[in-house]
Amino acid sequence: VLDSINHMTEEKDVQRAFDRVSLFMNPGALFVFDVNTLYKHREVLGNQTFVYDTEEVFCVWQNALDEKTDKVRITLDFFERDGKVYRRSSEHFSERAYSRECLEAMLQKAGLEVLAVYGDLTFAPPEKDCQRAVFVARKPENPEKTGE
């Protein structure tokens, strides 16, 4: 999974995805996904640059945070050794962080009930400085439970 939801940078697209997931779920089925948190986008990725230097590749990872939308524009530049020279390739994409409340509301609107939200690799609620949250939602056996 690894933050696929964050790659949808518009709420309407996330809502549409949740609606489609719900449409094809059997009653009682679970939907589990993870997201990068607001904390990670604001405090870890933010307007930071990271450099990774290995034997195979040299990578420069640059982030630009829009604080109004919590969107991070990510640019990855890879330099891969090819004999005596390096070949450069680049990737550009954006991610958006959504609040827990926003995601829970969208899941409920899609007819799903939120069973739990966990911190990354735990079965405990996410801490304030948690970088990844895991959501567990279910399509109810009785749709009236979510207000459909």
Indicate where each model-derived feature is located.
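Residues lining hydrophobic/aromatic ligand-binding pockets adjacent to catalytic sites
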Residues: 1, 15, 37
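C-terminal lobe and adjacent flexible extensions of AdoMet/dcAdoMet transferase-like proteins
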Residues: 94-148
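Short beta-strands and strand-loop turn motifs
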Residues: 1-2, 34, 118
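A short SAM/SAH-binding and catalytic strip from SAM-dependent methyltransferases
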Residues: 1-12
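A short glycine-rich, Lys/Arg-flanked "PGG" loop and its adjoining helix->strand segment in the class I
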Residues: 14-30
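SAM-dependent methyltransferase
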Residues: 11, 32-106
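Extended, non-catalytic scaffold segments that flank or surround catalytic motifs
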Residues: 7, 17, 47, 98-100, ...
